[in-house]
């Protein structure tokens, strides 16, 4: 679903949100059919992340080499000399890019916020009110057998706007699922727990290669959620070399058993995760 950024008028007092994608009728992120909103920004830089462009506050320019026809209109349009051709190959100097979008406007194979374009700026800034106007027709279609899922990135990094969105959805009785790494402060989780029907708890960094320093904090967050009778679905990505090891799985099993979490979701690793690294110019960390 393409979310259209709209000019904010004086009557719209709702909070602004940054997001990079919206999926309608998803069946993988909560019960039933879901409208899934992918929010921009993440405090965790997982080696296996398949959306590295979601991590910064604003996503970098994505370049799909296979969709480029070599017309060179971007070269003429960009005053910062971001685009250049060397021996027929389209190269991008990302350090000079100010994300103005002029190159996208001139590219015949690009639309500013559409995946698959030759050039693409994924991050969209929109108010909560404007976002709801665009997604609510889909929510009404699926409200009896689905709901809304807030994913990312890490949605709760935009706390004030997320609270406004959650409060509206709660008032409308839409089922609300929220995905998190569990690495934010317990105070943040305490503020929104009454508004969330299901926590999709991504076990991204606990134990294993980089997780030791985070173990105690994740345990504290789980303790707090369990005490508030929150419904939690732990989700474990089966990443080769990280979460498919016996020692890691045993540690996770002990943690889940300690908190009486008897149902887990083992998510298959996205083998095509390298696509967004290629398009964003962000170096891959996986060995």
What are the residue ranges of the model-derived segments?
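Flexible, acidic/Gly-rich N-terminal and inter-domain linker regions that tether
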Residues: 1-75, 80, 85, 97, ...
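N-terminal start-of-chain detector that recognizes signal peptides
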Residues: 6-12, 41, 120-122, 170-173, ...
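Intrinsically disordered, low-complexity coil segments
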Residues: 6-14, 113-115, 208, 213
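Conserved Radical SAM active-site core
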Residues: 55-194
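Short alpha-helix boundary/capping motifs
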Residues: 61, 65, 74, 197-198, ...
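Flexible, glycine- and charge-enriched loops at secondary-structure boundaries
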Residues: 121-125, 211, 215, 287
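Conserved AdoMet/S-adenosylmethionine-binding subsite of the radical SAM
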Residues: 129-278
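A structural motif corresponding to the C-terminal lobe/cap of the Radical SAM core domain
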Residues: 277-287
